[in-house]
């Protein structure tokens, strides 16, 4: 992979929380608490992953526990979002889209674990390092979808002048 691409990916992977901070602020201001909860939980899990990643890599010299912890973290995020979706604490459509985006992450983590210890495939590193940032980008986009829906809804509502009955 080109060095500029790897540098770009490293910058993005370290700043997911900062990329979601405007969404948290906007959803709180607009009192869209369903979207706020979704984004806040996602920020919490990105923050947890950012804090524990370096110590987990340092602790795990045999490359087993890191993938299990990361897969478990993704599954726990999915379970919490699904529970909140059922209990109407987050938008159900956002919950479903989030599940569909993130389902690839634990699968990739476990694939990477099995590959490192059993298969030793040459191309799995490329698949892993390429798809994981796209999954994270997709998750960030899902967090911003209610904002896009809000602005689309506001632009489709007619103004008072347009909706007034015609004058005689």
Residues covered by each model-derived region:
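Juxtamembrane "helix-exit" motif on the non-cytosolic side of transmembrane helices
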Residues: 51-60, 83, 110-121
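Short, amphipathic, aromatic/basic-enriched membrane-interface segments that mark the entry/exit
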Residues: 4-13, 34-38, 65-66
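Hydrophobic transmembrane alpha-helical segments in integral membrane proteins
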Residues: 1-21, 129-136
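A generic, lipid-embedded transmembrane alpha helix
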Residues: 37-58
